[in-house]
Curated annotation (Swiss-Prot):
PROSITE patterns: LRR (PS51450). The keyword Signal applies. Residues 1-17 form the signal peptide. Keywords: Glycoprotein, Leucine-rich repeat, Membrane, Phosphoprotein, Repeat, Secreted, Signal, Synapse, Transmembrane, Transmembrane helix. One of its GO terms (biological process) is positive regulation of synapse assembly. The keyword Cell wall biogenesis/degradation does not apply. This is SLIT and NTRK-like protein 1. It comes from Pongo abelii (Sumatran orangutan). Residues 212-263, 529-580 form the LRRCT domain. It is a single-pass type I membrane protein.
Length: 696
């Protein structure tokens, strides 16, 4: 019978996945009740799998697993955590969720998988989350969402997908999902259809659509009409046009149907027939741009009808050579002398300069395909094509370029020294691509570059010295990437005036060696980062306070810890952010100055983090310990010195006595004394050598 019991226990342990035990009972994790709810905190425990662990089975709990190494979730990963009511998995490097991973979590109402590396949501990704009401998946690498990804979430109300790489939402993605709050900020959406998408969320109460490259054309009419018919305060933030250029920076709600779709309903049978060929029109502005061959040139996202490129938001730069737009009949005339131009592109003369070559949206897959090569091109537009890589051989014939637009392609590879021949280039657009690393070698030769736009990429790493190759760089656009840190001296030797770092992954930014190098900054945008309010952010806060609101664009909201969530850190005092550093100091220790005492008691000194009159305990204690140890060694040294001197003194006395005895012995042994004892009369001393021992 005992053998059967042992075999049964062994088989049960094997079936349970070799569970080691309760994470609370074995104190693997911290388990505490907060306001009546059990919090199982397994933060930064190095977990790579959960199948060997279990949690309390007698009560419900909130499970915190952020900061581990759960990079992949396999089916039944949470089978032993069936009493969880919320699950936090931020910052795990999670990149794959196998369908069935959440089976057993039928009680979970809130799921946080933000700040990971998830690239797609497949069908049945969330299978098992029957009661899920809140899903947070911001700051990932989401590009693809299957139409059936959310079909199992029949109670989902809040969906947070901001700061990903989503360019489109599939049809019926929200079918049978009762969404009331939808956050799509900081993605790559150019349009949002009403049919089979927006029409499926009739109960929407809040929607956020900021920081997307909206293409304000006919396709956006349905979104505009839908926004006008939802509850008045449902739209949070702005929907700002990024293209076409004539509407760039304009709010969607300020546009008209005619603005978005100028050709709509323009054809009318009552209008007179077009004039004969010999008839002419008076010069005047046309509703839409035309190519040199007279065909309509439809505006594309991020591009201007005249080949221009968007400058996001308030980031204005000086007038570029493309600012002048030809009007009237002159715009429609072919180029003089039948100027050769690569197939599919349009070429224009720049007054008093070279050529402007517009190859936007021409299905170009390689710059090597652009033939014939024109050596006098000064502005080259290659936006909205299918270019995957660029090499230094591609620009050998374009040494006169001053503007290059490679935005909205599929560029993931930039060969070192690609731009080395472009010594006169001043504007470079490489936004909306797939770059992941920036290095000095990639930008070698751009000694006159003033404007660099690499927003909406997947940049995770900027190597030291990257921008040193561009000493004249003034405007740097790095927003909507995957940056978590910046190297020391990244801005050394560069006099930036405008810098955009919003919608990245920064938790804090160091002042020394990074921000303190921005001595010429007049505008910086840092919003949309998951700032962590801890002692490390205090110098950054003080730096931001010195800049002021006229330089620092938008508020900076805290992401962690929970008690500071979504708070503006400018409204918090330094001792709130770092209480251990700003511990109250006794007035007796600060009585040297009435003013400094007051500051120590209130903790409101504006720059107290750098104030030498207030010493951190972490500095004070080691200092006192050092003084104590030094004093102890000094006392011991003095004692040793005194003792050694005493011994030496005794030796000297002994040696002196011995010397005297030896001298006396010598005298007694002399022939003078041997002749007989010395006797003196009266008061004279009598010394008889024979009657005394010399050892006495």
């Amino acid at each position: 019978m005992l053998l059967w019991i042992l075999l049964l226990e062994t088989s049960l342990c094997f079936a349970a996945g070799n569970v080691t035990g309760d994470v609370c009972k074995e104190k693997i994790c911290s388990c505490n009740e907060i306001e009546g709810d059990l919090h199982v905190d397994c933060e930064k425990k190095g977990f790579t799998s959960l199948q060997r662990f279990t949690a309390p089975t007698s009560q419900f709990y909130h499970l915190f697993l952020h900061g581990n190494s759960l990079t992949r979730l396999f089916p039944n990963e949470f089978a032993n955590f069936y009493n969880a009511v919320s699950l936090h998995m931020e910052n795990n490097g999670l990149h794959e969720i196998v369908p069935g991973a959440f089976l057993g979590l039928q009680l979970v109402k809130r799921l946080h998988i933000n700040n990971n590396k998830i690239k797609s949501f497949r069908k049945q990704t969330f299978l098992g989350l029957d009661d899920l009401e809140y899903l947070q998946a911001d700051f990932n690498l989401l590009r693809d969402i299957d139409p059936g990804a959310f079909q199992d979430l029949n109670k989902l109300e809040v969906l947070i997908l901001n700061d990903n790489l989503i360019s489109t939402l599939p049809a019926n993605v929200f079918q049978y999902v009762p969404i009331t709050h939808l956050d799509l900020r900081g993605n790559r959406l150019k349009t949002l259809p009403y049919e089979e998408v927006l029409e499926q969320i009739p109960g929407i109460a809040e929607i956020l659509l900021e920081d997307n490259p909206w293409d304000c054309t006919c396709d956006l009419l349905s979104l505009k009409e839908w926004l006008e018919n939802i509850p008045k305060n449902a739209l949070i933030g702005r929907v700002v046009c990024e293209a076409p250029t004539r509407l760039q920076g304009k709010d969607l709600n300020e546009t008209t149907e005619q603005d978005l779709c100028p050709l709509k309903n323009r054809v009318d049978s009552s209008l007179p027939a077009p004039p004969a060929q010999e008839e002419t029109f008076a010069p005047g502005p046309l509703p839409t741009p035309f190519k040199t061959n007279g065909q309509e040139d439809h505006a594309t996202p991020g591009s201007a009808p005249n080949g221009g490129t968007k400058i996001p938001g308030n980031w204005q730069i000086k007038i570029r050579p493309t600012a002048a737009i030809a009007t009237g009949s002159a715009r429609n005339k072919p180029l003089a002398n039948s100027l050769p131009c690569p197939g599919g592109c349009s070429c224009d003369h720049i007054p008093g300069s070279g050529l402007k070559m517009n190859c936007n949206n021409r299905n170009v897959s390689s710059l090597a395909d652009l033939k014939p090569k024109l050596s006098n091109v000064q502005e080259l537009f290659l936006r909205d094509n299918k270019i995957h890589s660029i090499r230094k051989s591609h620009f050998v014939d374009y040494k006169n370029l001053i503007l290059l637009d490679l935005g909205n392609n599929n560029i993931a590879t930039v060969e070192n020294n690609t731009f080395k021949n472009l010594l006169d280039l001043r504007w470079l657009y490489m936004d909306s691509n797939y770059l992941d690393t920036l290095s000095r070698e990639k930008f070698a030769g751009l000694q006159n570059l003033e404007y660099l736009n690499v927003e909406y990429n997947a940049i995770q790493l900027i190597l030291p010295g990257t921008f040193n190759a561009m000493p004249k760089l003034r405007i740097l656009i790095l927003n909507n990437n995957l940056l978590r840190s910046l190297p020391v001296d990244v801005f050394a030797g560069v006099s930036l005036s405008k810098l955009s770092l919003h919608n990245n992954y920064f938790m804090y930014l160091p002042v020394a060696g990074v921000l303190d190098q921005l001595t010429s900054i007049i505008q910086i945008d840092l919003h949309g980062n998951p700032w962590e309010y801890s002692c490390t952010i205090v110098p950054f806060k003080q730096w931001a306070e010195r800049l002021g609101s006229e330089v620092l664009m938008s508020d900076l909201k805290c992401e962690t810890p929970v008690n500071f969530f979504r708070k503006d850190f400018m409204l918090l005092s330094n001792d709130e952010i770092c209480p251990q550093l700003y511990a109250r100091i006794s007035p007796t220790l600060t009585s040297h100055s009435k003013n400094s005492t007051g500051l120590a008691e209130t903790g409101t000194h504006s720059n107290s983090y750098l104030d030498t009159s207030r010493v951190s305990i972490s500095v004070l204690v080691p200092g006192l310990l050092l003084v104590f140890v030094t004093s102890a060694f000094t006392v011991v040294g003095m004692l040793v010195f005194i003792l050694r001197n005493g011994k030496r003194s005794k030796r000297r006395d002994a040696n002196s006595s011995a010397s005297e005895i030896n001298s006396l012995q010598t005298v007694c042994d002399s022939s003078y004394w041997r002749n007989g004892p010395y006797n003196a009369d009266g008061a004279h001393r009598v010394y008889d050598c024979g009657s005394h021992s010399l050892s006495d």
